[in-house]
Amino acid sequence: TINQLEYIEDKNFIKLINLKLSKNYKIKEIQELQLNYNTVNKINNNILLIKNKKKYILSSKSFDGINLIKSLTDTSSKANFFDIFDNLSNVIILEIDKTHLSKSNYLKQLNGDLKIENNKIVNASILAKYSEKDKFFFNVKNSNNGEKITTLYSDRAKPFVKNFKFIKGFEKGVLEFQSIKKNNTSKSVLKIDNF
């Protein structure tokens, strides 16, 4: 257990309170985490994670989501961000003012929640906007018959399709993605309209 730790280097700052690690050095629990640093993409990450009973609240003025988008669109990757935890089973409430998806595209007012069980997202409901007319949403739901349904909609396709090598010329379109997974078999549909 680490009761409190602060690290400051130039403009970079890390602070954590009440961090409990497993024998395998995975996070069992954390009460508070503050991060303020510049990423390799030269974007300031300003993040506050606070545990409130059985929920975590993740708030941020600025969040670099570029690598997150790359990991979500890399179908060959088996990596899971939540694997840094030792059996995370909590709700994470998201309140992010500005989420960078690329150097020139970002979401405003990203809000929602993730329900995590055993380090996996079982339910999610996230809304954001690029502008007053351009929207974004991401949902994950589990049906009663064992299907995991993932839906992503973006009025701007560019931040997502630029990571797919087989898609060229669709940057201006609207992106709709749906995946239904059952018994380790997945069926996915990707639509790009109005390009």
Regions found by a protein language model. Name each.
Residues T1-F195:
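Membrane-proximal interfacial segments on either side of biological membranes
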